[in-house]
């Protein structure tokens, strides 16, 4: 790791006190996993899995939950995966870029790893729909215990909360976001307090910390053992957020928050619920809320609703960040990205993603109507992403970090075995409602691979009739056209060929500018490119220059601002002397060798509706000329 990477990964954010960073991390990172106690044990003992609410059943499940939290979250994510940062950034797309770099010498392996990364990203979007739906539903369902006759109001109230959450996204959460940390700290303290109160009634429940109870559960219930992991995994939902949000807080604050507050609070609450079930098996209908005294029920519902809204906000923000990374890595069409904070570059809003998630969440709430029904569909996307993360990290450990196989392989096999068991336990959920996130993931995977392949084919088609730059410049020397004052910047994907916009301009206008710049924007497999590596400049003579701008997948691609770094006497990028020439291609599906006709038509539709270079690269509107061309694919 480089210095910048190490600082980010370690959480050395200048000007921010460690305690403040820890509280902020609790508010953003741990909302999802922190609201899991609302529905995990409720689902386990719902009757769907055949687990008896007795001494052995409660102890076995508690042992499985505790050791799953220890192995998957504490060991796998906190101790290992948080070290796999891409210059301080985490998440499935950052990890895919890292794995792509690690496997550069193995083209076939590289292709497989990229495909797996895209599948993981696609599943994340499916999870981004289920998390808000199940979290808010489970919180509002507490009203059923407080007031009789409110059962029919749960779904409408949940929809009101969720729709309001999506409506405020455009305005940003900069102001109220400062409350997320304190609210979630209060939530975890309440979780721990409720758990301690329950444990004091039946302290023998702490015996379930012994892993023997989990092993015994598998031995006594061999058929049920693997299947029950499909419910136990609900306690792990949100574990991927530890890695995805690492770029915001760094590794150390996330790890400290987990061990100092989050893990103890979760364990205490789960064991408190277990103690309640030992005393009153009928409490299995909603052990979380029934753990609280009657007078605290309404305040607890309010706090739980706030916590689930914060958890949902974190998932939605994660979807925005993932989309921006995927756009700049070339897997998703360009969309309008709106910044919602003048202070924080990472706080963004993408309308297309926001409204798509909202529609998906509304359909889930209307279709399943309860957190229990949704729990039967939850887990496929989560465990699939966790398994893919382990595979990608394995490639990074062995190929990039060069860990000795004798040390790395046993650890990786342990991760893959546990992740594989959780995933296998959740596969049957596909036929119990879990098809929704899977289908959403399949659709997104098709869109991403179609866009990526379509862009590659488009560049190849444009190259077929292209003119090599040296030949073109030689012809300019022989027959020099009329030159006009100023600088013309032509954006092109291939820096060694003449852009079509340049040929069209010369053909129709019979003039060239004094300085002609062929500009290529390249995105690296790293989050940020330092200013001293931002550009490359080559002079070809006759006033022609090739400029290559380098950006990371979290950088803001502001082309006019970046061109100011090109300090050359011959080049003048002053705003009133610079004109940008863009090409807009219209794709026509044909019988040429490439993609299937339906994928070509899909790509043409996406290209037509994608955000243009003008807005994406922040070009001045009054200094842009756009020329169109048709391309058969």
Curated annotation (Swiss-Prot):
Q: Which reaction does it catalyse?
A: K(+)(in) + H(+)(in) = K(+)(out) + H(+)(out)
Tell me which positions the record assigns to the signal sequence: none
User: InterPro entries given for it?
Assistant: K+_transporter, K_trans_C, K_trans_N, Kup
The principal localisation class reads membrane
Domain of life, per UniProt, equals Bacteria
How is it placed in the membrane, per its record?
Multi-pass membrane protein
Q: Which Pfam families match?
A: K_trans, K_trans_C
Query: Can you name a GO cellular component term?
Result: plasma membrane
Where in or outside the cell is it found?
A: Cell inner membrane
| Keywords for this protein | Cell inner membrane, Cell membrane, Ion transport, Membrane, Potassium, Potassium transport, Symport, Transmembrane, Transmembrane helix, Transport
Q: Name one GO molecular function term.
A: potassium ion transmembrane transporter activity
Cell membrane: present as a keyword of the record? yes
List where the protein spans the membrane. Answer: 19-39, 61-81, 112-132, 148-168, 179-199, 217-237, 258-278, 290-310, 348-368, 380-400, 405-425, 430-450
Entry function: Transport of potassium into the cell. Likely operates as a K(+):H(+) symporter.
Matches recorded under PANTHER family: LOW AFFINITY POTASSIUM TRANSPORT SYSTEM PROTEIN KUP, OSMOTIC STRESS POTASSIUM TRANSPORTER
Task: State the family named in the UniProt similarity comment for this chain.
Answer: Belongs to the HAK/KUP transporter (TC 2.A.72) family.
Annotated protein name in UniProt = Probable potassium transport system protein Kup
Recall the taxonomic lineage recorded for the source organism: Bacteria, Pseudomonadati, Pseudomonadota, Gammaproteobacteria, Pseudomonadales
Q: Which gene encodes it?
A: kup
């Amino acid at each position: 790791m480089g210095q910048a990477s190490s600082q980010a990964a370690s959480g050395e954010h200048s000007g921010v006190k460690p305690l403040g960073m820890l509280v902020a991390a609790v508010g953003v990172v741990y909302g999802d996993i922190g609201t899991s106690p609302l529905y995990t044990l409720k689902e386990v003992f719902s009757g769907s899995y055949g687990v008896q609410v007795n001494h052995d059943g409660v102890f076995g499940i508690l042992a499985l939950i505790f050791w799953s939290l220890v192995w998957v979250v504490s060991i796998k994510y906190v101790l290992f995966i948080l070290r796999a940062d891409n210059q301080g950034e985490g998440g499935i797309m950052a990890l895919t870029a890292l794995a792509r770099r690690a496997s550069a010498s193995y083209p076939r392996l590289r292709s497989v790893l990229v495909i797996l990364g895209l599948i993981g990203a696609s599943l994340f979007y499916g999870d981004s729909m289920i998390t808000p739906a199940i979290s808010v539903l489970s919180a509002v369902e507490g009203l059923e215990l407080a007031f009789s006759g409110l059962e029919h109001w749960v779904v409408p109230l949940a929809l009101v909360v969720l729709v309001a959450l999506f409506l405020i996204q455009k305005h940003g959460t900069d102001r109220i976001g400062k409350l997320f940390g304190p609210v979630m700290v209060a939530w975890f303290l309440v979780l721990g307090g409720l758990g301690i109160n329950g444990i004091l009634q039946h302290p023998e429940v702490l015996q379930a910390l012994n892993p023997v109870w989990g092993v015994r559960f598998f031995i006594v219930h061999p058929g049920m053992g693997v299947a029950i992991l499909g419910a136990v995994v609900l306690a792990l939902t949100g574990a991927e957020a530890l890695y995805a949000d690492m770029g915001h807080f760094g590794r150390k604050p996330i790890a400290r928050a987990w061990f100092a507050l989050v893990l103890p609070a979760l364990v205490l609450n789960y064991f408190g619920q277990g103690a309640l079930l030992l005393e009153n098996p009928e409490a299995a209908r909603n052990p979380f809320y029934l753990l609280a005294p009657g007078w605290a029920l309404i305040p607890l519902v309010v706090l739980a609703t706030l916590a689930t809204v914060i958890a949902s906000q974190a998932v939605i923000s994660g979807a925005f960040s993932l989309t921006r990374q995927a756009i700049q890595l070339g897997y998703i069409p360009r969309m309008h990205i709106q910044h919602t904070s003048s202070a924080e570059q990472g706080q963004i809003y993408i309308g297309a993603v926001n409204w798509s998630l909202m529609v998906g969440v509304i359909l889930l709430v209307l279709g399943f109507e309860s957190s229990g029904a949704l729990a039967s569909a939850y887990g496929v996307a989560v465990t699939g992403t966790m398994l893919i993360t382990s595979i990608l990290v394995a490639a990074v450990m062995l190929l990039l970090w060069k860990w000795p196989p004798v040390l790395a392989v046993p650890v990786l096999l342990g991760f893959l075995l546990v992740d594989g068991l959780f995933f296998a336990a959740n596969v049957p959920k596909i036929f119990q409602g879990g098809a929704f996130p899977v289908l959403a993931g399949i659709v997104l995977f098709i869109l991403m691979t179609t866009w990526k392949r379509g862009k590659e084919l488009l560049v190849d088609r444009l190259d077929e009739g292209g003119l090599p730059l040296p030949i073109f410049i030689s012809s300019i020397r022989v027959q020099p056209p009329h030159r006009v004052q100023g600088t013309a910047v032509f954006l092109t994907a291939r820096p060694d060929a003449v852009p079509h916009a340049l040929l069209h301009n010369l053909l129709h206008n019979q003039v060239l500018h004094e300085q002609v710049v062929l500009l290529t924007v390249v995105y690296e497999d790293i989050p940020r490119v330092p200013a001293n590596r931002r550009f490359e400049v080559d002079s070809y003579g006759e006033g022609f220059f090739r400029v290559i701008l380098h950006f990371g997948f979290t950088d803001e691609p502001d082309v006019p601002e970046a061109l100011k770094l090109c300090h050359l006497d011959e080049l003048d990028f002053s705003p009133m002397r610079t004109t940008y020439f863009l090409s807009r291609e219209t794709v026509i599906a044909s019988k040429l060798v490439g993609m299937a006709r339906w994928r070509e038509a899909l790509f043409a539709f996406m290209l037509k509706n994608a955000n243009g270079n003008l807005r994406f690269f922040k070009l001045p509107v009054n200094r842009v000329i756009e020329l169109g061309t048709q391309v058969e694919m």
